[in-house]
Amino acid sequence: MLKCKICEKSGIFEKFDEDVIKCKKCNSMYYTGSQNKEIPRVVSVTSNLKSSAQKKNSQLIARSYLQYLKKKANIDFENALDIGCGFGDFVEELNKIGINAGGIESDEDTVKNAKSHVSHGFFDELYDSTIKYDFISVNQTLYYFEDSFVILKKISDLLKPNGIVMIATVNTESSFRQEHKIWTQGCKICFGNEVWKSFDKFGLKCIDITSYDDNLFIDFFLNKSNMMSKSQFLKNLVFYVSKIKKLFVYKDNGINNFILLKKF
């Protein structure tokens, strides 16, 4: 009988889609297909227009990340590392407020188009542990790793005492995701909400879980699913860029979660 890789309970699964199952005990979800899909690139190598839109989106998201962090944590960090940093916009936002921040990104094409302080590389249990950090972020990235537990343990090893980990990730308990069967391409595993509260073994304590809707992601999905016109999608995009509408909206049962973990 199949056992959940997260809570280790048996026989408690429900099918989410063709290749994804959900544990009814811990609400974690994971891909079960024989060959996972390629992790999507951040940067488009085929369209300058698409790349420009991606960069603008990245800037909007980075500012929203910083707004959340300022709201929930004391950000007097000396240094920071952003894992899977994409174009490096969140890294840049951190540097603007006096934090010595750097980022690591695995896709070479993205790094070529990235801001300064971004280096090409891969994060795993062998990542250099010489430097210790006050703050580490891994946003919309943790679910791409084969073993998220190994990655969290490594992150804990890299943190200074009382250091903070910020994670933006999928909310597996979102009714919108459940209704529309939304699974992120390349995703391996997503933890249920209660799982985030059980990382004492890594020296990490959960200090916040905040659910939110990424409205641009929702609009993009609705447009691709022919539930929103292209003109309305583009109009909303202008509203987000001009700050007439909020990109991120905090709400119960949002499609994503912010997680804050503290090293003890």
Regions found by a protein language model. Name each.
Residues 1-131, 135-139, 149-152, 252-258:
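Conserved N-terminal segment of class I S-adenosyl-L-methionine
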Residues 166-190, 194-199:
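Short, glycine-/aromatic-enriched active-site segment of Class I SAM-dependent methyltransferases
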Residues 149-164:
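A short glycine-rich, Lys/Arg-flanked "PGG" loop and its adjoining helix->strand segment in the class I
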Residues 140-144:
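A short His-aromatic
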Residues 15, 204-215:
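Conserved S-adenosyl-L-methionine
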Residues 210-264:
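A C-terminal cap/extension of S-adenosyl-L-methionine-dependent methyltransferases
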Residues 115, 146, 160:
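Short conserved AdoMet
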Residues 44-51, 175-185, 224-228:
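Short glycine/proline- and charge-enriched loop/turn segments
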